[in-house]
């Protein structure tokens, strides 16, 4: 589930596939976990 979420964010941001934690750091997903 977390991996799928990371992939979803990757598709939206056009960034390489990062691990879930890295994705959160790179992308402010609007869920309060973004940097």
UniProtKB/Swiss-Prot annotation:
Keywords annotated in UniProt: Disulfide bond, Hydrolase, Neurotoxin, Postsynaptic neurotoxin, Secreted, Toxin
EC number: 3.1.1.4
Post-translational modification: Contains 14 disulfide bonds.
Principal location class: secreted
Tissue-wise expression: Expressed by the venom gland.
Cofactor: Ca(2+)
Record-given protein name: Phospholipase A2 bitanarin
